[in-house]
Amino acid sequence: MEEQHYQLLDGKAVSAQMKKEMAEEVAQIKAAGGKIPHLAAILVGHDGGSETYVASKVKTCQEIGFKSTLIRFEEDVTEEELLRKVDELNNDPDVDGFIVQLPLPKHISEQKVIEAIDYRKDVDGFHPINVGRMSIGLPCFVSATPAGILELLKRYHIETQGKHCVVLGRSNIVGKPMATLMMQKSYPGDCTVTVCHSRSKNLKEMCLSADIIIVALGVPEFLKGDMVKEGAVIVDVGTTRMPSSITKSGFKLTGDVLFNEVAPKCSYITPVPGGVGPMTIISLMRNTLLAGKKAIYK
């Protein structure tokens, strides 16, 4: 048995620590007679993944001491009705931040809904104003998954300056913001960034030259052992629900990295589950706290 020389980037442990820090801060706000941060979430329909995420967000709010409101609509809600609710939350002074859980049903334009959210309450960081401010390095709400990954790298003191970072995936939610953040002029950042996607040629060569690989493709076990150099840092954003006869729920979460092959070559790697997932939720909570304190937008 060769000795394990990689270290886990333990999102579960880090998020628990951050939860504790935030709960203490909320207790202080409360003791001083300040306003308790309030997060609202809109959930449309009954998508299994969305139900799980939203339940987890509400539970974390309670654990930290935030106020939370869950607003449910049926699958057949009209776009107009949804936009009216968004407008109502925009104008509710008690709500500091809110999210609309994606994906939305086909008959509703996600972009239209995102753009209707007041960017000062857009704690998901999806509004074009927040995305734009992020890309030019201004204070903003950074979307939760990229923000969570940065915090994870920071708390493990991962060296990033001058390193080659390969981002696999170019989605607006993870790939693009991740690439932007990894090349910003601050820590963690200052990387040389390559973005690869389904149309990329020499993908294996790119990965083999990477010091840091952030995998956000949604393709289970895509990154294999022969694509990774010794000592690389691997961040696995993938969470695909795969059928499983072993688990109680009948499915297991599978990452985009073939863990057993890749881990032995790494210096650091995130597990799935327990890596990026918990960091995403805790980063949404941090954005809510910042919104409550008016720390980014007055």
Swiss-Prot record:
Catalytic reaction list: (6R)-5,10-methylene-5,6,7,8-tetrahydrofolate + NADP(+) = (6R)-5,10-methenyltetrahydrofolate + NADPH; (6R)-5,10-methenyltetrahydrofolate + H2O = (6R)-10-formyltetrahydrofolate + H(+)
One cellular component (GO) term of this entry: cytosol
Binding site for NADP(+): 169-171, 198, 239
Matching PROSITE patterns: THF_DHG_CYH_1, THF_DHG_CYH_2
Pathway: One-carbon metabolism; tetrahydrofolate interconversion
Pfam family, one: THF_DHG_CYH
Keyword Zinc applies: no
InterPro entries membership: Aminoacid_DH-like_N_sf (IPR046346), NAD(P)-bd_dom_sf (IPR036291), THF_DH/CycHdrlase (IPR000672), THF_DH/CycHdrlase_cat_dom (IPR020630), THF_DH/CycHdrlase_CS (IPR020867), THF_DH/CycHdrlase_NAD-bd_dom (IPR020631)
Keywords of this entry: Amino-acid biosynthesis, Histidine biosynthesis, Hydrolase, Methionine biosynthesis, Multifunctional enzyme, NADP, One-carbon metabolism, Oxidoreductase, Purine biosynthesis
Signal peptide segment: none
Gene3D superfamilies recorded: Leucine Dehydrogenase, chain A, domain 1 (3.40.50.10860), NAD(P)-binding Rossmann-like Domain (3.40.50.720)
Oxidoreductase found in the keyword field: yes
Entry's EC annotation: 1.5.1.5, 3.5.4.9
GO molecular function, one term: methylenetetrahydrofolate dehydrogenase (NADP+) activity
NCBIfam families hit by this protein: PRK14185.1
Family: Belongs to the tetrahydrofolate dehydrogenase/cyclohydrolase family.
HAMAP family for this protein: THF_DHG_CYH
Name the UniProt record assigns to this protein: Bifunctional protein FolD
Organism of this sequence: Parabacteroides distasonis (strain ATCC 8503 / DSM 20701 / CIP 104284 / JCM 5825 / NCTC 11152)
Gene that this sequence comes from: folD
